[in-house]
Structures are given as structure tokens and as C-alpha cells.
């Protein structure tokens, strides 16, 4: 008997694959702009944002109503020289409650005692 059986081997020849390399388009002066505005009277959601880019400079602003009823507006710019800079404005939307004068104290009328026979 045979102790080891012969093993057939096969080596495939390398296949040449042509790859097409497509360079990503590079825009040396990219530009965009967008914005949105949400005013939902049912939920009270109130927010907006606008932003634009021209080359390496991005500028914009966003606005929202904080839980304390103050509108916060942030205006910002960003560029490679100055980095990101923002200015925050806060504007009260709800007038402060006026302290009411004390109402007169009302006393309960005395309870009449009824005699039962």
C-alpha cells in the first residue's frame, strides 16, 4: 500500500486587471448656502439657521428659544486665519410677570346652629 498519495497542485497565472483611476474633483473655491426656519405653534418649537461658505470662509447664524423663554441668536464666522468666532445675543420673549396686589382676604360666614327637637 501507498503511505502517501500524490497531491496535484495547480498555480493560476496572474491575471492583469486594468484599473481606471478617477481623481476626485477638487474645487479650489467651494461655495454653498442653506437655511431653515421652524415655527411650530403646536409644540412651541422655534428655531432657524442660515449658513454660507465662500472659499475657506464660513459664516452664518442660528436661533432658538431657550427653556427660560429667551431667544438665543448666535452669529458666527470661521476661516483658517481667525478660527471659529461666535457672538451670542439673548433677547427676552416673555415679559416679566407683574406682581399683583394682594387680594382681600375673604372670611367664611359663620355656620348657623340648628336645634333639633
UniProtKB/Swiss-Prot annotation:
The Chitin-binding type R&R domain covers which part of the protein? 29-95
Q: Please list the residue ranges covered by the sequence repeats.
A: 12-15, 108-111
User: What is an example of a Pfam family matching this protein?
Assistant: Chitin_bind_4
An example Gene Ontology cellular component term from the record?
A: extracellular space
Question: Which keywords are on file for this protein?
Answer: Cuticle, Repeat
Q: What domain of life does the UniProt record list for this protein's source?
A: Eukaryota
Q: Which GO terms describe its molecular function?
A: structural constituent of cuticle
Which PANTHER family does its entry note? CCP84AA-RELATED, STRUCTURAL CONTITUENT OF CUTICLE
Q: What information about domains appears in the record's comments? A: The tetrapeptide (A-A-P-[AV]) repeats found throughout the protein are also present in many proteins constituting the protective envelope of other species.
The record's function comment reads:
Component of the cuticle of the larva of Tenebrio molitor.
Name of the protein described by the UniProt record = Larval cuticle protein A2B
Q: What species was this sequence derived from?
A: Tenebrio molitor
